[in-house]
Amino acid sequence: MTDKIIQQLEARINDLECQLAFQEQTIEDLNGALSQQQLQITKMLDQMKYVVGKVKNMDSSNLADPSEETPPPHY
């Protein structure tokens, strides 16, 4: 092989190594973001379950019958 071909191959290998390093960092960053989002989703699901439970357990006797409500003022 000539020196020129060897230099081209070395340059190509160097470029591929740089791309691989960048992709590895990107995968690590995406994995961190995904893990954080999963924690947020889990927390929101727990909060929704709590709110749904509260709504289901609300005492409907605190609400007046619509027929007993005074009509809203008309402008």
Swiss-Prot record:
It comes from the Bacteria. Signal peptide: none annotated. Coiled coil: none annotated. Pfam families: SlyX. Belongs to the SlyX family. This is Protein SlyX homolog.
